[in-house]
Amino acid sequence: MSFIRKKSMEFLKSFEVPAKNPSEEAQRRWRDAVGTLVKNRRRRFRMVPDLDKRSQAETQRRKIQEKLRVALFVQKAALQFIDAVRKTEHPLPELARQCGFSVSAEELASIVRGHDTKSLRFHNGVDGIARKVAVSLADGVKSDDAGLRAEVYGANQYTEKPPRTFWMFLWDASQDMTLLLLAFCAAVSVAIGLATEGWPSGMYDGVGIMLTILLVVMITAASDYKQSLQFRDLDKEKKKIDVQVTRDGYRQKVSIYDIVVGDIVHLSIGDQVPADGLFIDGYSFVVDESNLSGESEPVHVSTANRFLLGGTKVQDGSARMLVTAVGMRTEWGNLMETLSQGGEDETPLQVKLNGVATIIGKIGLAFAVLTFTVLMARFLLGKAGAPGGLLRWRMVDALAVLNFFAVAVTIIVVAVPEGLPLAVTLSLAFAMKKLMQERALVRHLSACETMGSASCICTDKTGTLTTNHMVVEKIWASGAAQTMSNAKGFDQLTSSMSETFAKVLLEGVFHCSGSEVVRGKDGRHTIMGTPTETAILEFGLAVEKRARIEHTGAGKLKVEPFNSVKKTMAVVIASPSAGGRPRAFLKGASEVVLSRCSLVLDGTGNVEKLTDAKAKRVASAIDAFACEALRTLCLAYQDVDGGGGDIPGEGYTLIAVFGIKDPLRPGVREAVATCHAAGINVRMVTGDNINTAKAIARECGILTDDGIAIEGPEFRNKDPDQMREIIPKIQVMARSLPLDKHTLVTNLRGMFNEVVAVTGDGTNDAPALHEADIGLAMGIAGTEVAKENADVIIMDDNFSTIINVAKWGRSVYINIQKFVQFQLTVNVVALMVNFISASFTGSAPLTIVQLLWVNLIMDTLGALALATEPPNDAMMKRPPVGRGDNFITKVMWRNIVGQSIYQLVVLGVLLLRGKSLLQINGPQADSLLNTFVFNTFVFCQVFNEVNSREMEKINVFSGIFSSWIFSAVVGVTAGFQVIMVELLGTFANTVHLSGKLWLTSVLIGSVGLVIGAILKCIPVESGSDASDRHDGYRPIPTGPSAV
C-alpha cells in the first residue's frame, strides 16, 4: 500500500504548477503525464490553452514588434517596410467626401503607424489633420456625429474569435470515445436482438443504451454551454475601460469601444492609450511602448514627436490626443487579435485533479479488464461444459460477449473521472459570477482559487479602508489652524486673510493640481480628478464664493505631475498676481514640502522667515492633524526668474497645510476582525504620514499593542536578518514607496512562505501586484496599468469586498473537496460491486444503462450540486490552507473508506442473500433483486451526496434550502430514478418495485447519514494535527494557548 502511495505521489509531482506565470515546460509536463487515458480530449482540455497556438501567437507578436521597431528607429523606410509596398496614394472614399472629411482612413492610419513626419507636415500638422477630419481641438467631436465617424473611419473594436454555440458543445460532448464504443455496441445489440428476438423486444436493450447516451451528451453539453456563457459575460466586463474625452465642448467619460476618429482624449499617468493618435498638448508626457515594440526604454512624446500608438501605457505626465485610427487599423488591434488565440492558463487545482483523474482512470481500466476477463472466463467455462462445447456459437452467445465488452467499457466510463478538473471550472465560473454581483471582477481563474489560501493581505489605506470621499476638515494658514467643517470655519478663514494672501492661495489651489474644474452641460461645476485633488479644489471653490475673489486663468510654463516616488507635484505658471511673472507652486506630502521651505506667508500677504521655532509649530500642527486621522498636504510657492528653467528644489514660501478627512468605510473594522479570525494577517501599506496611518489602523483594528508601525525609509534600510526579525511584527508601513511594498511582498513570500494578496491603484504598484500571489487592483481609483497587472479588480474599492473574494476562494476549494469525496466513493463502490458480482455470479448487477445513469449522477449532476454550494461564515473561522497541504485530506479518506465499506457490505449481502432476506420469489426474482440493488445503490449515492455537504460537521442539513441548485439536483435525481424504475423498465432493465421495497431502498440509503455521523466522531490524526478540519483548515486554538 505504501509503495502504491509513494508511486502516486511521485506521479502527481508532474501535476504541480505555480498559480501565476507557469513555465511552458511545467505546462507540457503535466499534459504529457496525462497520456492517452482520456475519454474525451476535446471536452477535458477545452479550457486548457493550446501551447502550439500560443507559441504561434507569440511568434506573430514578435513580428509585429519588429515591424514597429523599424517604424520607430528607421522612420524613413517605415511605411515601405510595414506595408511591404511602395508608398501609394490613398484615394478619398465618396462617403468620407460626402460627410465633409478630406482624408481617408488608410492615410490617417499610415501617418501614426509609420511615424511619418513628412506626411504630417504635408497635412499642416495636428491642426491641419483636425480640419480634415472636421473637428475642433477645443470642443471635440459632436456626439451626434460619432456614429457617422464610426461608419467612415471604423469602430474601435478588435476582431475576436466567434463565440462557441451550443451545437459546438454538443459535438464536443459526443466525442467521448467510450460513449462512441457503447453506441457501436448498442447498434450491434439492436441488430442481433432483432435477428434473435424480433420486433420490438429485440431492440429494447440497444435503444435504451442509445437514449441514455443521448441524455448524458445533452446534459453535459448544456452544463458546458452554461459555463461558457458565464465566462463570456465576465470577459466582457474585463474589457470595459472608460476614457475621458472632450465632446460637445465638455469633458466626459466614454467607453474605449466608443472612441472614434477625431475624438480629443485626455490622458494621464497609468492610462492606456485607447487608439492611435497625435499629441496635441501636455506636460512631461512619457509613454511605455514595450508591449508593442519590445523596447523597454520609455518614449517622450511632445510637439517634436507627436505619434501615439494605441495599447501603450502612460508612464508620466498628462496630455490631450487627437484620435487618428481605431480598431483593426491600429497595430494594437492586430496584436489583440493574435493574443486572443493564446487562452488562459489552467489553475493549479485543475492540473492537480487531472493527475488524480489519470491515476483513478488507470485503476478503473484495470478493473474493467479484470471484470471482462472474469465474465469471459466464467462464460467460456460454462460453454465448454455444454453440448457442442466451444465450437458451437449462436447469436445469443455473440450477444452475451458483446454485453460483457459493453459492461467493461461502461466501467471505464464510470471509472475515469473526467468531471474532476471540469468541476473546478464549474465552481470557479459560479464563484466568479457571484463575485461580479458583489463588485469583484476576477481577471484570472487561478486568482479566485489562490485567494482561498491567502494568509496575508497588504492593503492600501485611501479608498480601500476609507471611503475616498474627501473633504478639507482643517487648514493651517496665517499661523493658526482653522476647522473647515462648517460655514463658520470658512467665514473665520476668509476674514483672517488679506486679498493678497487669498489670491496666492487660490492660484496654488487651482493651478497646482492634477485635476480640473469643468462646467457640465447643466452649467454646474464638476471636478475631474482624484479624490484628494477634488477635496482641495472644492475647498478653493468655497473660499472663492465667500471671499468673492475669483482665481484668474494662467498659462502653465512647466509641470511636474505628482507621482508616488517624489510625493510632490510642481508647476510654473505666468502668475496674474505677480504681474505675469513666472511663479512656481509645490504641493505634496507635508514633511517633504516643509523641508523645502525657508519662508512662510502670513495672513496679510507678507513673507516672513521660517525660523526653527515657526517650523516646529507647523510640524506640531501637521502631527496634530495626523493624529486626528487627517491626511496632510502642504502648499508652497516661489517666484522664479525666467520661464524655461528647472522647477526650484528649495527656497519655497509656505502658504498652507491642509488636513483632509477621509472617513473609515462602514464595516471595515468587522471585515478586519473577520480576517484575523480566518488566520489572515492584515497589513496597511500607505504613503501617508505615520501618525495618520496609525490612527486609521487603530480605528479599524489593524494595529495592535504588540504590532509595529514603521516608515518606508527605515524599512528599506534594514538588512535581510533584520527584516526577517521585524516583518512578522509589521502591521503598518507609512510613507512607503511602491518599491517598499514590492520588497515586503517578496520577503513575505520568500522568507515566510506566505500566500500574499496585495492591493494597489497606481502605475508604480504594478511590480508588487505582479509579484504577489493575488494582485488586487482598485476599480475606481486604479489606473489601467494597475488593473492590467492585477488578478482581481475590486470594483467598489472596498476592503470588505476583498474578504468576499477570500470567502469565495475558500468555498471553491472546499466544494471541490466535497465533490472529490463524493465521486471517489461512487467510483469505489460501482467498480467493486460489478467486479465482485462478476466473480461470484458471472453477471454484472448494474447494467450499461444503469451505469451510465450513475455516471451522470456522480459527474455532471454531482458537480452541479456540490461545486456550486455558496460559502458560509464558518469558512472564515479557520486558518487558510498551506501551500504544501494535501488536497485529499485524511478526513476525506476516512469518509470515503467508511461509506464505501458500508455500501459494499450492504450491496454484497443483497446480491448474495437478497432473495431470502427480502422474500423475493417467482420467475422475475432475479430481475426484481437486480432492480432493488440498483435502486438501493442510487439512493445510497443520493444520501451520500447530502452527507458530502459537510465533511466534518454532523448536521449536514444546515443551509440546504439556501442552496437551491443542490436541492434541485437531489430532487431531479430522485424523481428521475422513480421514472427509470417504474416507467422505463423495458429500456433500463428494471421491473416494478412494491412500496415496501421502495421504502427499504430509501431506508438503506438513509442509513448512510447515520454512518456519516458516526464516522465524523472518529479522530483521524494524533498529536497537534488531531484537530485538522475536513477541508484542510486547522481550527484556531482557543484559550491561553491561542495568545
From Swiss-Prot:
Regulation: Activated by calmodulin.
SUPFAM superfamilies per UniProt: Calcium ATPase, transduction domain A (SSF81653), Calcium ATPase, transmembrane domain M (SSF81665), HAD-like (SSF56784), Metal cation-transporting ATPase, ATP-binding domain N (SSF81660)
Reaction equations catalysed: Ca(2+)(in) + ATP + H2O = Ca(2+)(out) + ADP + phosphate + H(+)
Binding site for Mg(2+): 761, 765
Membrane-traversing stretches: 179-199, 202-222, 259-279, 356-376, 396-416, 824-844, 846-866, 891-911, 956-976, 998-1018
Function: This magnesium-dependent enzyme catalyzes the hydrolysis of ATP coupled with the translocation of calcium from the cytosol out of the cell, into the endoplasmic reticulum, or into organelles.
Stated name of the protein: Calcium-transporting ATPase 1, plasma membrane-type
Provenance organism: Oryza sativa subsp. japonica
